[in-house]
């Protein structure tokens, strides 16, 4: 029988910009690449952080790269790689941000901030997920990268956010299976449709698509005359989602075919099913260190650099 697992708190994580406040910064850069002028590392870094704070992503990248160029062996240079990646991410330059993260990982694999680099890569893939009617290659990449974060750093805030996003990615993949399954069912390829709906139940059972997948199995099995299978899936739907609209439809469909459903649907306003309660939690809830700011897209910033 279908089991409903405990949902995780939905969190949207704030960014942490590791930077000193700016004192006497240079004026706004006019060109995408800075003209070489030797400057103190603290000034370059803090100016880059200031540009980032103002939303001038490309200028921020220029200053952080200048830190690396002028002071390649300093602690600031290491920090600047991740800040460059963060600025690229904020500017929607995901391929560049992934490249920055990979560079940091290759240079400093044992550094505590490597966890942020892995997280940044995962979030960049996550941001590139497309709708369910298109190829899901980016979705699969995001899922693999997010799982990597959880596996490597299970007790971190990065893993907490990654787990939430894994749930969202699974919902996306389930949606793709459902779209294909509906198409098969509509075009008379019932067995192929059943395979898609069963995949949702077996691989993505905690997603929002599970009730419909069970209903579609009832519908498909009735189409090919497998009444007992239809009744069994209807019972699973009823026991797990008695108040869901898909069970109301399944209940009616089974009755219309002379099959007595095992569970009565809940009345309107009755207690919601477990999955519905999980999915209704506020996904905009914020978890951040004291005094930190919220940032675009809920990215967790580079802690511990």
UniProtKB/Swiss-Prot annotation:
It comes from the Bacteria. It is found in: Cell outer membrane. One of its GO terms (biological process) is Gram-negative-bacterium-type cell outer membrane assembly. Disulfide bonds: none annotated. One of its GO terms (cellular component) is Bam protein complex. Gene3D superfamilies: Tetratricopeptide repeat domain (1.25.40.10). Part of the Bam complex. HAMAP family: OM_assembly_BamD. This is Outer membrane protein assembly factor BamD. It comes from Caulobacter vibrioides (strain ATCC 19089 / CIP 103742 / CB 15) (Caulobacter crescentus).
